Design a protein with these regions (language model features):
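Fold-level signal for large, globular catalytic cores of enzyme and receptor domains
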Residues: 1-3
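Solvent-exposed soluble domains appended to multi-pass membrane proteins
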Residues: 9-340
Length: 340
């Protein structure tokens, strides 16, 4: 029975309020593909990614960011990222495709619409999107940067072709770097850490090269590794792909350190069972970054811990994180308190 979707999507709150307050600060919401709590709970994976987390922590400290981390339950495992996206964006628990398609027929208010109603430009960065996407109208984005819009001129890496670092560089150049603009709500679904986790693009330190006509020269050796991996090789590639996207978060913190945004980076689901294990919990890490400590106070009050290493406590489900984001964004104006 999914009638509850229509019952809650037309709540009095949505009709009467319809806006949020974040002091016109940008909000970057990054879903890191296949970033599950197995990276912390499996000692082998944690040993691999720990240097990347330490580097991210150093970048955050250098550029004046405070950090907090928690664990949330995802509605899916090993795939079907769109279910987690829809759950967080709407505050409804969307755990099946039936629920998802039913949701699209409702007038549920998404995070994009909340911020858009407050004067924000709502954008989606979806480098893995290569087809028509009617769902975009439901979410209410002003602009969807799909694979075609990103105009990637380089070699294809893996199944999804476009490296996340290129996507971020292109998007920031077109949207985030503009001085005189409306505040930005940005949803970014990464793809480089998608199964099969290779070949992995090199990290480019010289960002202007990413926006040149040849963003990845001399990668023949990397591309020769574009085969099927199994067992330990697959697990190693998974760790390396996660490190890549952790580096991507570092890049975003550096790029935007002069703009004081709120950055939320989280997993969409655990990796497949061959990586996480068949009995792994359906949980994902959530990292919050802000240069204003008071912004993190509400997350800390909800059980988040300081830094990038979560404790083992699951704080709730991703539909509940939706409300926490609204409460945090609107803390100075009004506290949202509704049930889904």
């Amino acid at each position: 029975n999914i009638d509850w979707i229509k019952e809650t999507s037309t709540s009095k709150l949505a009709d009467d309020v319809g806006y949020v307050e974040l002091d016109e600060r940008d909000l970057y919401l990054m879903f890191l593909e296949s970033y599950g709590t197995t990276v912390f709970q499996n000692p082998t994976y944690f040993a691999h990614i720990r240097p990347g987390l330490e580097q991210l922590s150093e970048v955050a400290e250098k550029y004046g960011w405070y950090t907090a981390t928690g664990i949330y339950q995802a509605p899916t495992f090993g795939g079907a990222s769109w279910l987690s996206h829809a759950t967080l964006m709407t505050g409804h628990w969307i755990s099946t495709n039936t629920h998802y398609h039913k949701l699209l027929t409702t007038n549920s208010k998404t995070l994009a619409l909340w911020f858009q109603n407050s004067g924000y430009r709502a954008t989606a960065l979806l480098p893995g999107l290569k087809r028509e996407w009617p769902e975009g109208k439901f979410y209410g984005y002003d602009k969807v940067w799909n694979a075609k819009a990103l105009s990637y001129p380089g070699p294809p890496f893996g199944w999804w072709e476009i490296p996340d670092q290129y996507s971020l560089a292109f998007f920031y150049d077109k949207e985030g770097a503009i001085d005189l603009r409306d505040p930005l709500f940005s949803f970014f679904a990464t793809i480089t850490s998608h199964m099969p986790f290779h070949p992995l693009p090199p990290i480019e330190q010289d960002w202007p090269i990413l926006l040149s006509s040849e963003p990845y020269p001399n990668v023949e050796k990397v591309m020769k590794g574009n085969g099927v991996l199994y067992g330990q090789d697959l697990q190693t590639s998974y760790s390396q792909a996660i490190i890549y996207d952790i580096q991507l978060v570092s890049d975003l913190l550096r790029l935007t350190s002069h703009q004081n945004p709120l950055v939320i980076a989280l997993g969409d689901h655990q990796p497949p069972a061959m990586i996480a294990g068949a009995n792994a919990p359906w949980t994902v890490p959530v990292h919050v970054f802000s240069q204003d400590q008071t912004t993190l106070d509400r997350f800390n009050s909800a059980g988040f811990v300081r830094g990038l290493i979560p404790n083992n406590k699951t704080l709730g489900r991703l539909d509940e994180l939706h409300q926490l984001i609204l409460n945090t964004a609107n803390a100075s104006k009004q506290t949202f308190n509704y049930q889904n």
